[in-house]
Amino acid sequence: IGSTGCGKSTLVNLIPRFYDVTSGDITLDGVDIREVKQHELREKLGYVPQKGVLFSGDIASNIMFGNSHGSDDEMIEAAEIAQATEFIDTKPEKYKSPISQGGSNVSGGQKQRLSIARAIAKHPQVFIFDDSFSALDYKTDVTLRRALAEKTSGSTVLIVAQRISTILHAEQIIVLDEGKVAGKGTHAELLKNCPVYREIAESQLSRKELEAALNEQTDGKEDQIHG
């Protein structure tokens, strides 16, 4: 998380190797990603950019683009998790409904949900959501992320966000400020130790919401201890 222009997208774009690191390295399962063929690397990734990308065809071909041999059940499950079925089911042709090049015949939120469904249907090792929830209303955002958390429990999930509510319950939050890491930790830890994060949180959440989030995290830790 961080303000516009702080380097969030630049950082995650290093993972699919849109460009390479100039120092240090990025490893996946202990292997430097520069030693992996680009095609093989990207097969392991489910990447959803800031602006959803759709192709001419139909809804089904767009969702299953990264999993051409997948089943209808996989497609429907991905659409359900991405909260896309609510508008797909209203269309006469359902999953065979045509999509124009660039998705010009669907709304921004619908385009984003289909892009998210495509990533889910791919069953990737690593999900990268680059501010992918910004076009969604708050209720859809919350419902989608809850369903996504259940589905992606065996994968690494990286979420770039400007809305603090999107990353509130992440295992680890990285705060960027002017291209540098300003803090790392949970929501509760960062509220105490990171002025940049605290400023973002207080500008977006009410005192009541902040306290509720802290209580949820505390309860979650107690459950883990007693469990």
Residue ranges of model-derived segments:
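ABC-type nucleotide-binding domain
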Residues: I1-G227
